[in-house]
Amino acid sequence: MYIIGTDEAGYGPNFGPLVVTATLWRMAEFDFSSVITSANFAGIDIGDSKQLYHSGGSLDKLSKGVLSALASIGIFPKNDTELFDIVGKVSQLPFMFAEPEISLQKISGELKPESFNFFLSGSFHKVLSQIIFPAEYNSLLEYYGSKGELLSNITLKLVVELIADLGIDLCEQILVLCDKHGGRNCYTDILTRYFQDELIKVKEQSREISIYNLRGMEFRFIAKGESQIPIALSSMFSKYIRELLMQRFNFFWQKQIPTIKPTAGYPEDAKRFMAEIENKLKELKTDKNEIWRLK
């Protein structure tokens, strides 16, 4: 059976991108009892990215998990630019995120073959991330009307693309695991939008889990979904990509205003940061909406 896990990073901040990731696995079966809070496989931590990385801390745990997963499918990005090109769907990096290139070779060189074994045994297959910078985010927010709708649509597009890329027939068994989208419990409408010719059967809709069946597919939207490994790895990819891009964003602004303290982009600190860069933003003739997410 095929397993697709999805999750995001950057749903709440005002600065920086929203990153949504889908990972594809192929397994003989999937064990729902394999709940994890954080697990260690040959020195590689797999778990909720919010537990593996804290603002201002080391990215090492995320780096090792993400790069081990990629190494298991023969992908070895030398730097973050290559990572964005290989994994991410983004046409061009905005100028505030353009440099410096961050080398990943030191961490890649420290990985041991046994650390790949977990991903090989779990048949990790592919990863796809959508990187949405503030200007595009604001346009999509206006189009979809809410953050929850925006996230649901981006997520379903990634799922559909993964299925299409592999030519998977919907008669095959496909299990899609998603972290819940902003507390939403009902996903019938969004599934109908992307699978118009399919009959959507509601199996369960609750605060904890929402389950839907259509032909050979099952969708599970799970509260605290990072407890499932395919969702956890998607969470790690999303967070790692976002944090690498935020390092570039802070580098740009520290070149413009050497005394400014870096920001993680979340609302309270984002207000402080915006107040400090507002005049420089005018000098750069850059509209606030190009870097500030409206919600």
Please identify what each model-predicted range represents.
Residues 1-295:
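RNase H-like, Mg2+-dependent phosphodiesterase core
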